[in-house]
Amino acid sequence: MTPMSGDIWLADIGAETRRSVYVISDDRFHRLAERAIVAPLLPAGEPGRTPPWWITHDDPVIALERLSSIPVDRLLERHGAAQHTTTRAVQRAVGWLTGAHR
């Protein structure tokens, strides 16, 4: 199965650690680089105290300050996809973090 932007996957992030991640990069990037840009899903903190670079996805948050690139073959199992509104929020936040919103 090919990972798509907005998917949630269980990933091998090294040191025998597995974590749910949100896939940010698209399938074209995956084919060309054989890597995926991902952000970990973390437990939500105290309500109303989440930084703007954390995007809420159900109970966990997508922690955009922890972006990383991993080989596509370390994406082990697809767990679903984020809602369109979540994907748009991630795209906007990444744009602000990288200055691409200008």
Question: Which residue stretches match the model-derived regions?
Answer:
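Compact nucleic-acid interaction/catalytic patches
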Residues: 12, 17-55
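C-terminal terminal-subdomain/extension
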Residues: 1, 55-102
